[in-house]
């Protein structure tokens, strides 16, 4: 299939912009711990032992752990970071492209268009405001969350929009996601069950790709959930506190209500999605009910997460992606004249959205450039302390730019995990953080 020159140019621009943002985002938090482990450099036996140890003592996310230990190495840190940045930038483009194709339900789209401009504006605006972009350019979250989200988008496009049967890709994707993240597994299983129920009641044939994906995802999910490390981690995070299922549900709802900085936009996208689904005459009432209930109930997958280490932007990433795609898909394929007129009206204001989009991208680049400059300044201090063999330096902490910028820096507590990982990575005994000024 011939690809238009404008599509290629826009693809290059998207990849280039996100590569710059990824490049400006420094290593943070778990990045140092993963890189310091240097599992791959120590040989494949140590590499696999590390994954097995994690399975027993910390997490069953085998595929996610395997990827991060493969791609993040202290010995080859510059190459590692470059590869992650490059792959992540391409993933951004692929996610933008395939999510747009899913939304428009087309196999061929023109990126140099008013429709795509409006879509990309809301993509950047909503994913920036939710902290989605900030989190997935963090190296660890890129590998352990965003790459999986991108894979799911590609799988859905191939299986549903393109309707191309590929059993091996379906099995691979299902098993990979099954071993990737328990929240992803829960959401995927709920949505698949809703699809199967709707197809059965409508007496329609079940897509074999989705069937094989579901089977593989369930098998992988069982292996993941059975990991002893999951319960060690959850017990550690919750300080050994045991509460009833009802109280866990109440806790989840309470956190959704009381943490609007993290939950407001995803919940609004969910609400808009449900309104559009139930008012779309192109969807039967039966299908609307089944899929609406499934989408809303997927939130309750977060119940044990909320109990153990609270809701945060990172655990909501899959919901940001799913709710956004559903909302935009309904918006672009709605039956009512009101929605159609609204879309045409937005298209007529495309030049306004272009200006706003450029302003958003410039704001993002400016903020991350400030973070980059701070990190370079602190690196000079680190080099100075290393050269003078100072084992317990006091280093400045980066100021909080906004809630939607991922910081997770060292703290004033030298025993905090972030400080310990940072110290080990740079060869210090202890690291103390202090506020600038």
Label every PLM stretch briefly.
Residues 91-99, 103, 148-160, 189-197, ...:
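Transmembrane alpha-helical segments
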Residues 166-167, 334-360:
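Signature aromatic-anchored transmembrane alpha helix within multi-pass, membrane-resident enzymes
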């Amino acid at each position: 299939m011939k690809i238009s020159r404008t599509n290629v140019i826009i693809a290059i621009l998207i990849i280039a912009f996100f590569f710059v943002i990824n490049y400006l985002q420094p290593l943070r938090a778990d990045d140092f711990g993963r890189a310091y482990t240097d599992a791959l450099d120590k040989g494949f036996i140590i590499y696999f032992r590390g994954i097995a140890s994690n399975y027993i003592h910390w997490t069953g996310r085998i595929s996610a752990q395997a990827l991060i230990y493969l791609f993040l190495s202290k010995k080859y840190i510059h190459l590692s970071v470059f590869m992650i940045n490059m792959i992540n930038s391409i993933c951004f483009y692929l996610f933008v492209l395939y999510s747009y194709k899913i939304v428009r339900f087309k196999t061929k789209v023109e990126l140099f268009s008013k429709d795509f401009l409006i879509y990309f504006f809301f993509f950047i605006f909503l994913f920036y405001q939710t902290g989605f972009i900030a989190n997935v350019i963090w190296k660890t979250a890129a590998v352990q969350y965003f790459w999986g989200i991108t894979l799911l988008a590609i799988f859905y496009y191939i299986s549903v929009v393109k309707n191309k049967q590929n059993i091996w890709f379906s099995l691979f994707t299902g098993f990979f996601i099954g071993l990737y993240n328990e929240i992803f597994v829960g959401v995927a299983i709920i949505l698949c069950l809703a699809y199967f129920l709707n197809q059965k009641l409508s007496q329609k044939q079940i897509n074999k790709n989705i069937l094989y994906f579901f089977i593989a995802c369930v098998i992988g999910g069982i292996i993941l959930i059975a990991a002893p490390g999951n319960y060690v981690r959850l017990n550690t995070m919750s300080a050994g506190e045991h509460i009833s299922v009802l109280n866990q549900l109440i806790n989840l709802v309470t956190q959704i209500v009381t943490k609007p900085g993290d939950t407001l936009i995803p919940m609004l996208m969910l609400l808009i999605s449900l309104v559009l689904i139930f008012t779309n005459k192109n969807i039967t009432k039966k299908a609307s009910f089944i899929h609406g209930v499934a989408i809303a109930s997927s939130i309750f997958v977060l119940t044990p997460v909320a109990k153990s280490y609270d809701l945060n932007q990172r655990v909501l990433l899959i919901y940001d992606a799913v709710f956004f795609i559903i909302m935009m898909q309904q918006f672009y394929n709605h039956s009512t004249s009101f929605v159609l007129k609204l879309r045409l009206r937005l298209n007529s204001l495309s030049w306004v959205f272009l200006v706003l989009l450029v302003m958003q991208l410039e704001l993002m680049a400016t903020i991350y450039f400030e973070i980059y400059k701070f990190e370079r300044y602190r690196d000079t201090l680190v080099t100075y302390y290393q050269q003078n063999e100072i084992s317990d330096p006091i280093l400045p902490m980066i100021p909080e730019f906004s809630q939607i910028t991922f910081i997770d820096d060292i703290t004033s507590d030298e025993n905090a995990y972030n400080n310990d990982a940072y110290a080990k990575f740079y060869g210090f005994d202890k690291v103390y953080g202090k506020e600038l000024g």
